[in-house]
């Protein structure tokens, strides 16, 4: 069955705390995802180049991305996708997809679906590259298979990924 992303997910954009406040950055408190972090990661993201402090979270109002949430870049490098291995935060070029529990979904299935989707359809050409906005992304449709089919798709694609990696 086909669904618009907004029907099955709560879409959450990240945020960048002020770079002018050095106490916000690289304290080791909380991992903060940027596009660069998604460039060379596998299915799960567990490490980030930068971290933010608790005061950065509180004072900037940035929202947490819970563990096992699919995240995807949607500005400049569209479609770089991963699943959070733990609670994290992200910048505004990363969208987190919180499952609304409308239909049975496995994060690994969504990961592969997003990874192989042609995101150029509906993207706008920006000065430095392509970009999607939240409204356009929310209207995009994806095919959701039954939970049994999702498990089979994940199994096959995991096997292929392992063969390619080795």
Where do the language-model regions lie?
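Basic, amphipathic alpha-helical recognition segments used for DNA target recognition
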Residues: 3-10, 39-47, 83-88, 95-144
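Alpha-helix N-capping/helix-start residues
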Residues: 54, 134, 147-148
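Short Gly/aromatic-enriched secondary-structure transition segments
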Residues: 22-23, 48-51
